[in-house]
């Protein structure tokens, strides 16, 4: 499930409140009842994305001088770039779960 901020775990995607899509914080994300992985941003994670196993947050503070992060959903490869022109690549599997 690709979303800006998050989803309510107990509701189908088509029954979600827009406020949740836009403003929910990642630390309140629970596993979605569908079993699908939630991929979002909106809540800064520091230099690396966070993988909870059931949810992934890619917000690494690009607007505040941090890294811009992108995830290839098929391969699990994460690319990052910053304002200094540096880039790096890692696998979703390289991130600790939790």
Per-segment meaning from a language model:
Residues 1-67, 73-88, 93:
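Acidic, His/Gly-enriched loop-helix segments that form or flank divalent-metal centers
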Residues 97-98:
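A short C-terminal boundary segment appended to hydrolase-like catalytic domains
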